[in-house]
A protein has these predicted regions:
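Positively charged n-region of N-terminal signal peptides that target proteins for export
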Residues: 1-4
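Hydrophobic pocket/interface hotspot
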Residues: 36, 47-48, 56, 71, ...
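A mature extracytoplasmic/lumenal domain signature
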Residues: 52, 62, 86, 91, ...
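Short beta-strand edge/turn micro-motifs at domain boundaries
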Residues: 119-144
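Bacterial N-terminal signal peptides
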Residues: 7-16
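A short gly/proline-enriched turn/hairpin at secondary-structure junctions
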Residues: 55-66, 78-81
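Short, low-complexity N-terminal intrinsically disordered segments enriched in polar/charged residues
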Residues: 15-54
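Surface-exposed, charged secondary-structure patches
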Residues: 76-112
């Protein structure tokens, strides 16, 4: 009886662990978010082009809203530039071919030679394309 109880306890523990593990789709989205973050930090324009959907709507915490072309142009020209940039406390929710991502945007932004600490919240919408690639279709930042 002790062995049966031990086996059942182990199975319950393991099944809880498996349920808590991220899915492969969540891992793909997390990787896409990381690639976007690194592309923004390092001004990797081809990577930004590859990750942003043509119909992207990119909202800033200031209320400014950009399309794909304007978002990438600001990174390319240095209007949006970063000394450091990372996403923290990320939560990914999947719904069919859409991923909703909430995270904390933590950066040392560069305004000319001035370093500006930036701590805002982000809400991103990613969509899985027919080719299996995840593209950013929407982003809204807000102050907390």
């Amino acid at each position: 009886m002790k062995k049966a109880t031990l086996v059942i306890s182990f199975l319950c523990l393991f099944s809880g662990y498996a349920a808590a593990a991220p899915t492969s789709a969540e891992q793909e989205v997390a990787q896409a978010v990381d690639h976007l973050t690194q592309a923004m930090l390092h001004k990797d324009i081809p990577q930004l082009q590859a990750l942003a959907a043509e119909n992207l709507t990119y909202g800033h915490s200031s209320g400014n809203i950009q399309d794909k072309k304007a978002f990438i142009a600001d990174i390319e020209t240095g209007k949006s530039a970063f000394k450091t940039l990372e996403m923290k406390n990320q939560k990914i929710t999947l719904s069919g071919d859409v991923a909703l991502v909430r995270n904390h945007f933590s950066a040392q932004a560069l305004k000319g030679t001035e370093v500006v600490p930036t701590e805002i919240e982000n809400f991103q919408i990613w969509q899985k394309q027919k080719d299996g690639k995840w593209l950013l279709i929407g982003r809204q930042a807000f102050r907390f």
